[in-house]
């Protein structure tokens, strides 16, 4: 399995390949090869900055001679008008790395900003905000890093690091008890130590999951606030609980106040708006 650094290197290589192709002919035709310059990253709206470390890797991978002065680090609140970094390099390098760096930082900062709003919304409760697998193909590690920078927590990274029995698994497997039993048989056969979470859609499934046992967390899928409170009381701390499905910024605190341990929010990565910023020449 590829490491995070290897996945990010592949992403950077692919992004440069699709953007530059056989050459940035606009830059090559009008900028002298050895011309030097300086650009700064300007924040154009308030938010949480994210992607600084990955941006540094973009610059270093394209041109190791690029000099980056970081003024604001990942996870820091920024205001409109703040300068996050200054980069001194060949002008050709500045121009050819500009868009990829901005695409990464705007996306990651947008995710971190939205995540932070949800986290702040839950202050005073015990509930943690989780992301989901509803990420942009190829960008999952980047987007999940941004969630953590914004103060959220990562759910499973992929299909390999946790067992999550969802409705389709349960239905195809012939029910909750069969699904959990097969999980344990599989994990024992493969010598794997993975946590098991199961999704339940109603109180009958909740009762069956609890009676069966052998699980770490129960996901309450599309439960109302009232039913969530009832379910949490029934679970009584025997298993971790997670709310998921149809939860919005306006309703998330109501669910948290039911006492769930986690709330997963797909909107953190699938419906986010990038944070506005620019990379402009400076003195």
PLM feature spans:
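Acidic/glycine-rich phosphate/pyrophosphate-binding loops and surrounding catalytic core
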Residues: 1-212, 217, 226-234, 239-242, ...
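Short secondary-structure boundary segments
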Residues: 221-222, 245, 267-268
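Cys/His-rich Zn2+-binding cysteine-cluster or related metal-binding knuckle/ribbon modules and their
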Residues: 249
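Active-site loop ensemble at the mouth of alpha/beta enzyme cores that anchors a bound cofactor
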Residues: 278-283
């Amino acid at each position: 399995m590829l490491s995070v650094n290897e996945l990010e290197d592949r992403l950077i290589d692919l992004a440069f390949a699709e953007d530059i192709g056989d050459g940035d002919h606009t830059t090559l035709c009008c900028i002298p090869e050895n011309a030097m310059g300086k650009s700064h990253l300007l924040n154009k709206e308030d938010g949480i900055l994210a992607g600084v470390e990955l941006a540094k890797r973009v610059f270093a991978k394209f041109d190791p001679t690029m000099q980056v002065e970081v003024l604001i680090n990942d996870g820091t609140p920024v205001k409109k008008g703040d300068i996050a970094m200054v980069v001194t390099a060949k002008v050709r390098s500045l121009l050819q790395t500009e868009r990829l760096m901005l695409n990464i930082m705007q996306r990651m900062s947008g995710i971190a900003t939205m995540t932070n709003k949800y986290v702040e919304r839950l202050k005073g409760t015990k509930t943690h905000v989780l992301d989901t697998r509803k990420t942009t193909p190829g960008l999952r590690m980047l987007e999940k890093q941004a969630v953590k920078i914004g103060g959220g927590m990562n759910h499973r990274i992929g299909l390999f690091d946790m067992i999550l029995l969802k409705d389709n698994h349960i239905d195809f497997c012939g029910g909750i008890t069969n699904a959990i039993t097969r999980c344990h048989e599989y994990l024992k056969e493969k010598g794997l130590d993975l946590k098991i979470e199961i999704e339940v859609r109603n109180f009958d499934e909740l009762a069956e999951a609890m009676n069966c046992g052998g699980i770490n967390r129960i996901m309450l899928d599309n439960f109302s606030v009232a039913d969530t409170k009832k379910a949490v009381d029934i679970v009584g701390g025997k298993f971790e609980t997670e709310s998921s499905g149809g939860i919005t910024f306006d309703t998330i605190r109501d669910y948290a106040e039911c006492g769930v341990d986690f709330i997963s929010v797909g909107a953190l990565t699938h419906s986010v708006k990038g944070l506005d910023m620019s990379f402009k020449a400076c003195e």
